[in-house]
């Protein structure tokens, strides 16, 4: 079976930065002003989670709570005993253009008991969180990044994402076409060629792709290519080289597709991205 995450993670990395380990008591809030999300591991204790004034969920067993994008949230715990957390900021390279981050729901809550393959990582992470070992920060950050990959696996394997790219990657046939696009965006992918990758007829493939992924195959291909182009633009690469690598025959063809996708030319986008950085 093709590796569904290899090309995604090779092109668009995910990173974590641990910022809390220990008890949280009473009311604790995180705003959405910073350009990253959070991954919280609740080791013990009861936690009420609120999004604004609305009670979103109640956690009463060891669980993880992932916010892949900035989203304000509050935790309400017992004032005296609280709950034990280990928390990290998470960042998906490219921000909103990152296809992994964009494919995830606004938040994910999973009991740790549903992550059996992750137990050795979690045990080491909790042990490290309690220690004062040298390299503790770097160790925790890397362990959180491994947990993120495990979350992606679970969401696909357990079919917990109903639409979008991850839903397509969970489909035994569609995943072959998606992986082919991710691994070789420079190829001249026709609808027939992608349907052949999936082992489906042209019509069946187009319908199934649109229903599961939420885009036509052609729209998805363009979005993937332009996402890669944006990454290369941030790295200062020339439009001519980028056009060849992401599947456009010329700078002009890339510029037309780029403007259709983003509303601006590659140079305009690069200048505005540099100002925002």
Predicted regions and their residues:
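Terminal helix-turn-helix DNA-binding modules in bacterial transcription factors
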Residues: 179, 183, 187-193, 200, ...
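Aromatic/histidine-rich interaction motifs
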Residues: 99-123
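Solvent-exposed, amphipathic alpha-helical segments
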Residues: 45, 117-128, 176-184, 228, ...
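N-terminal regulatory/effector-sensing and dimerization cores
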Residues: 16-106
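A short, N-terminal "cap"/entry segment at the start of jelly-roll beta-barrel domains
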Residues: 1-15, 26-30, 106-113, 131
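Short, Lys/Arg-enriched, Trp-marked, Pro/Gly-tolerant hinge/linker segments that flank
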Residues: 107-116, 129-144, 148-187, 191-198, ...
């Amino acid at each position: 079976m093709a590796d569904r995450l290899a090309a995604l993670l090779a092109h668009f990395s995910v990173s974590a930065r641990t910022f809390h380990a220990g008890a949280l008591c009473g009311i604790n809030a995180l705003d959405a002003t910073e350009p990253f999300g959070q991954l919280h591991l609740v080791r013990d204790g009861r936690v009420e989670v609120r999004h604004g004034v609305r009670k979103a969920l109640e956690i009463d067993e060891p669980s993880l709570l992932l916010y892949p994008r900035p989203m304000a949230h509050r935790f309400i715990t017992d004032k005296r005993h609280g709950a034990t957390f280990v928390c990290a900021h998470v960042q998906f390279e490219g921000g909103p253009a990152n296809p992994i981050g964009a494919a995830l729901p606004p938040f994910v809550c999973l009991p740790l008991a549903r992550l059996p393959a992750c137990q050795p990582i979690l045990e080491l992470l909790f042990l490290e969180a309690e220690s004062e070992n040298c390299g503790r920060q770097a160790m925790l950050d890397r362990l959180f990044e491994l947990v993120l990959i495990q979350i992606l696996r679970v969401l696909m394997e357990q079919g917990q994402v109903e639409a979008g790219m991850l839903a397509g990657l969970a489909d035994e046939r569609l995943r072959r076409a998606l992986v082919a696009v991710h691994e070789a965006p420079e190829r001249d992918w026709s609808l027939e060629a992608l349907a052949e990758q999936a082992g489906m007829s042209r019509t069946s493939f187009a319908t199934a792709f649109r229903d599961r992924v939420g885009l036509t195959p052609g729209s998805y291909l363009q979005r993937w290519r332009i996402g890669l182009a944006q990454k290369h633009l941030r790295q200062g690469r020339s439009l001519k080289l980028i056009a060849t690598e992401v599947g456009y025959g010329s700078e002009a063809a890339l510029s037309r597709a780029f403007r259709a996708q983003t509303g601006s030319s590659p140079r305009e986008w690069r200048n505005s991205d540099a100002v925002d950085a």
